[in-house]
């Protein structure tokens, strides 16, 4: 793979008309740092106005990147609910002015404490039609450990406000927390079911370096939950939610029928998308690009008319490995016929040999031309998928 730093290259270097499916907008601000989070953000809002101006300017600089209708928009972060409705409108109006926007889904990630009745009402004047609410836990002591800014009661109120205002709602939950018991997790699942939201994301807590959680583990203040217990909690969520009528369509995601996340599904299908804002990633054809992960640098580069991009040109093996990684994390699985015509004979022999081996182990199953990982092994999916990776 080739890494290109485009801060020194002319804008025309990447002005191709890609068939984008969606736009991701990174809002790099948070009220405070969560114990487990290693995403790019700032807890100071002093540059928010300058950031919004830079974001609008970046759209102008990248107007030639998109020639297909933008069908999904996703405000991620960070904490996008730090934006006021008028700021969201400025951003979406500029998107509509710059690109061909035909939105089917416009998602705003939000913290429960931000979703007051007044704020949710103001969002009705925007293009946003879906709220992804970072509940994480319904237990206040867990929220305090996570350094979250909301309470369990605020989570319930936020979902109620969002439902009453007519938004599609998704909630995030975290399992495999330190010392989490199966009983505690089952109580979380039952509370989520009471809300009956259209979409639920359930993530296993992961240990990321340079986080407060990593520091606590290093100092032996807390201990990671063992993998077997974490896997049992994953399977408990699957059994519970599917029994309640949810479709487990991707390892971490459940939806009521027809309510799958359209924007995120484009990632798993490797559909091209455009990322705006500091640290935001874009993908098209055989190229992945990402903006500088520094708010001040991002604002300065954009103000100077320079895109602060670095890019990775994917080789064939990289594209194939990504296809396997994304497809095998979904319930749909991977159609091996789509790879046969683009693999070299040597790659294909390795691939088919690995399929036979993993099928014999019971780690994958095959139905006609489609291979998939059975649910009972989904928690170990990344490990299983890596066995298929082409390294040479």
Predicted feature locations:
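C-terminal scaffold of the Radical SAM
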Residues: 18-22, 41-62, 68-345
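Local cysteine-cluster metal-coordination motifs and their immediate loop/turn environment
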Residues: 28-39
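Basic amphipathic alpha-helical segments that dock to polyanions
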Residues: 355-359
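A short, conserved structural fragment
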Residues: 360-369
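Minor-groove-contacting beta-hairpin "wing" of winged helix-turn-helix DNA-binding domains
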Residues: 370-374
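Short, amphipathic alpha-helical interaction segments positioned at domain boundaries
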Residues: 378-392
């Amino acid at each position: 793979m080739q890494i290109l730093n485009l801060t020194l290259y002319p804008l025309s270097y990447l002005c191709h008309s890609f068939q984008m499916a969606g736009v991701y907008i990174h809002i790099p601000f948070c009220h405070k740092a969560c114990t487990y989070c290693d995403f790019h953000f700032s807890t100071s809002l002093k540059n928010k106005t300058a950031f919004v101006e830079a974001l609008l300017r970046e759209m102008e600089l990248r107007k030639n990147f998109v020639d297909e209708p933008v069908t999904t928009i996703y405000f991620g972060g960070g904490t996008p609910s730090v934006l006021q409705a008028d700021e969201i409108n400025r951003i979406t109006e500029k998107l509509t002015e710059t690109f061909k926007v035909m939105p089917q889904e416009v998602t705003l990630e939000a913290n429960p404490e931000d979703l007051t009745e007044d704020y949710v009402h103001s969002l009705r004047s925007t293009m946003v039609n879906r709220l992804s609410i970072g509940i994480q836990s319904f237990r206040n002591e867990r929220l305090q450990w996570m350094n979250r800014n909301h309470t369990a009661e605020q989570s319930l109120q936020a979902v109620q406000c969002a439902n009453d205002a007519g938004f599609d709602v998704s909630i995030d939950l975290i399992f495999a927390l330190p010392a989490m018991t199966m009983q505690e997790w089952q109580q979380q699942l039952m509370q989520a079911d009471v809300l009956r939201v259209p979409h639920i994301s359930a993530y296993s807590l992961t240990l990321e370096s340079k986080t407060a959680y990593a520091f606590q583990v290093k100092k032996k203040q807390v201990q990671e939950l063992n993998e077997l217990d974490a896997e049992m909690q994953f399977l408990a969520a699957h059994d519970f939610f599917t029994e309640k009528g949810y479709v487990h369509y991707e390892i971490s995601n459940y939806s009521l029928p027809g309510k799958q996340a359209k924007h995120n599904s484009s990632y798993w299908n490797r559909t091209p998308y455009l990322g705006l804002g500091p640290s935001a990633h874009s993908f098209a054809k055989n190229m992945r690009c990402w903006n500088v992960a520094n708010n001040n640098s991002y604002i300065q580069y954009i103000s100077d008319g320079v895109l602060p991009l670095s890019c990775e040109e994917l080789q064939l093996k990289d594209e194939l490995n990504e296809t396997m990684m994304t497809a095998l994390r979904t319930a749909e699985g991977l159609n091996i016929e789509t790879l046969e015509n683009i693999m070299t004979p040597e790659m294909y022999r390795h691939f088919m040999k690995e399929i036979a081996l993993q099928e014999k182990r019971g780690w994958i199953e095959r139905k006609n031309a489609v291979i998939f990982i059975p649910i009972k092994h989904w928690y170990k999916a990344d490990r299983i998928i890596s066995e298929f990776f082409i390294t040479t």
